[in-house]
A protein has these predicted regions:
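Short coil/turn connectors at secondary-structure junctions
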Residues: 1, 19, 76-80, 105-107
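N-terminal glycine-rich anion-binding loop in soluble enzyme alpha/beta folds
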Residues: 2-63
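Glycine-rich phosphate- or other oxyanion-binding loops that anchor nucleotides, phosphorylated ligands
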Residues: 53-55, 61-89, 95-96
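Active-site histidine-anchored catalytic micro-motif
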Residues: 82, 91-138
Length: 138
């Protein structure tokens, strides 16, 4: 089983690699610049920019197409995919993941964590450890 999450989980690239998790970045716009969260903007840098610019960021979810691409690639080695995302009450990420899940030839289960940041990250970590221990989605 493969795991997909978004950068709203606040897991680092290194943590995702260690856990075998695919992370899709949220897009963050501050002023005239757009960043890929977790790729070219770390959580620490994000908070520093908030402090120094005094601006509120605009964010956007990974696109349905980005989810389709990720699911399709992962399904080449394992058709079972667990897609764990930040709260649907705060972001459209879970919805984009659900739409994409219907477009791929894979068994994708989308989990709306109803939280964000480390709350989502902990759920991703727990799922990764459970999969390594041989547990199924149930």
């Amino acid at each position: 089983m493969k795991i997909v999450t978004d950068s709203g989980s606040d897991l680092t690239k290194e943590q995702c690699q260690e856990l075998g998790v695919t992370m899709l970045p949220l897009k963050v716009q501050l002023g005239e610049r757009t960043y890929l969260s977790g790729v070219d903007l770390s959580a620490e840098e994000f908070y520093e920019l908030l402090d120094t610019t005094g601006q509120m960021p605009l964010t956007s979810t990974p696109s349905v197409g980005e989810f389709v691409d990720a699911y399709t690639k992962l399904a080449e080695s394992d058709r079972e995919i667990l897609s764990i995302h930040i709260s649907s009450g705060l972001s459209g990420t879970s919805n984009a993941a659900r739409v994409a899940a219907k477009q791929v030839d894979a068994d994708v289960t989308v989990v709306d964590t109803l939280t964000l940041s480390s709350g989502t990250g902990w759920q991703v970590e727990a799922a990764a450890h459970a999969i390594k221990a041989g547990w199924g989605k149930e």
